Amino acid sequence: MSDKIAIGIDLGTTFSCVGVWQNGKVEIIANDQGNRTTPSYVSFTETEHLIGDAAKYQAAINPTNTIFDAKRLIGRDFNDQSVQSDMKYWPFKVINVGNKPYFEVSYQNESKQYSPEQISSMILSKMKQTASAYIGKEVTDAVITVPAYFNDSQRQATKDAGRIAGLNVLRIINEPTAAAFAYGLDKNQDKEMNVLIFDMGGGTHDVTLLSLEDGLFQVRATSGNTKLGGEDFDNRLVTWCVEDFKRKYKTDLNQSAKALRRLRTACERAKRALSSSTQTTIEVDSLFEGIDYNVTLTRAKFEELCSDLFRAGLEPVEKVLLDSKLDKSQVHEIVLVGGSSRIPKVRQLLSNFFNGKKLNETVNPDEAVAYGAAIQAAILVGQTDEKLQNIVLVDVTPLSLGLETAGGIMTNIIDRNTTIPCKKSRVFTTYSDNQTVVTIQIFEGERKFTKDNNNLGTFNLEGIPPAQRGVPQIEVTFDLDANGILNVTAADKSTNKSKNITITNNRGRFSEDQIERMIREAKEFEEADNKKKAAVDSKNELENYTHSVKQAVTDPSNSNNIEESSRSQIESKCAEIMKFVDENPNEDQGTYDLRRKELEDLWNPIAVTLYAQKNNQSNQTSTESTGPTVEEVD
């Protein structure tokens, strides 16, 4: 059995989760706060950067420097329509750096800029630390999940984030596929079962239809919307409340980032409450300019505000049924994944779509993706547990891959939902007479024109013998591996001249030097965190030691054994140190250690004397009580 350990990480828009395969099962690992999911938040202050729960606590008091939703920006251009529409809801600043979105924050009183990959790497680093602390040694091998409908840019950017975090990313896998592992691991299914995974999370929505039989997980079709999730429902509630506040108090909340952040937190809480009750109150004390705000929100009103978004959640369901050529009656199980799948209206619409079919709630919606990623990680590092032996995953490519032909037309070579790995070829010809060079432009997407799709790369095949248009035969081959890496070859059949390119989507990605710089910065963050922790530990030890010395020196039982001048000097030193700690909470470890030594130099000689005196008293008492233990009987 392999003794290598690898972890599975669900890098979520709003929450992240990590799991590991141990002792024949998946363990979902709790963080240092005891929570099994960690907020995907990073906060920057004058003294430190915080990740997870501690960062989310900062959101209300430090909104402009507390970053969330990095997943909605990763791998996207600044001018992307979804980036521009999301920006108006964020209290933090997003700037344009080479048509890439960057977060601008104040950290240690300096203006700093961080890419979505860097913020994501900090969250991944937190998950890595959480797992390493639980396992008892550093873990670097990991499987990271992404939405099934993430394009190549977003997948590669996520992989870069993992590398910056110091992880060896074994594989990037689709979230609903991972959730299918969580559902199907213990199912001894000898008859084929069609399972639909409905995954609606905080920022993205995926639907995958797969068949499950004897440990074979065969993805039939996948679809989704990378701009639909719980955050969008929160946005609708925030907009509604802002308008309500303006109507009631003639004041625009959009003036205050802090007020909007507090309102968003209250709206998110109300949304969750409406999953179990039909009415709740959005209430925020002193929201803006001293005004206490409260409004009643019914489930019916919430459903009305988000009705178009809820209906949009069914579009990928229709698409996967169409692509897989299955009727809805042929779907045996509908498995719910992601926090937003708890919303009653979402469940009702989904059940009604399948003619009232009961939905499967056997997996934990918040943990299923990390659970499945941990299974895949264990398989990839060669864990030979019997339960893992027969599991085989056959996945598909979520987007069509092709090239541009005359008129800017997208001509597919590999259609979406084609099983991977795969290899496909098509023959093309020249467009002009005596054309000696052919430009191969590679795209992914479903639109008819390449300008509306995602450009993956370009190369030229030269040295084609001059001939009339339509005569040369150029064979173009697309070879897509299990990791989704595409190799494209173009060959002139008459001369056997060929050229190829491996698509790693360098367009818009970081250079090797940039990634190395980010890795160094991540290590600097880690070193700073370690120094900060050491300083906090030293400060706590100084406080505890000072309290114990003060307690000892003022103990009535020691009053006869300590000279008044010494007692006064030590009490004064204790008061001085406690005042210093209160006024200087952010000093380095060495400073706190030095203050402790000052107190030790005063107290230790007295402590030694006290110990010796008490020891002598104990010995005397013991001697005095020693005597005959029997009495002579006459």
UniProtKB/Swiss-Prot annotation:
**Signal sequence, renumbered to the chain:** none
Which parts of this chain are annotated as the region Disordered? 611-634
Spell out the InterPro entries in the cross-references: ATPase_NBD, Heat_shock_70_CS, HSP70_C_sf, HSP70_peptide-bd_sf, Hsp_70_fam
Q: Where is the composition biased (Polar residues)?
A: 612-628
GO MF term (any one): ATP binding
Q: Which Gene3D superfamilies match?
A: 1.20.1270.10, 3.30.30.30, 3.30.420.40, Actin, Chain A, domain 4, Substrate Binding Domain Of DNAk, Chain A, domain 1
Keywords for the protein's UniProt record, in alphabetical order = ATP-binding, Chaperone, Nucleotide-binding
**Which SUPFAM superfamilies does UniProt cross-reference here?**
Actin-like ATPase domain, Heat shock protein 70kD (HSP70), C-terminal subdomain, Heat shock protein 70kD (HSP70), peptide-binding domain
Q: What does this protein do?
A: In cooperation with other chaperones, Hsp70s stabilize preexistent proteins against aggregation and mediate the folding of newly translated polypeptides.
State the PANTHER family in the record: HEAT SHOCK PROTEIN 70KDA
Family from the record: Belongs to the heat shock protein 70 family.
What protein is this chain from?
Heat shock 70 kDa protein homolog
Taxonomic source organism: Acanthamoeba polyphaga mimivirus
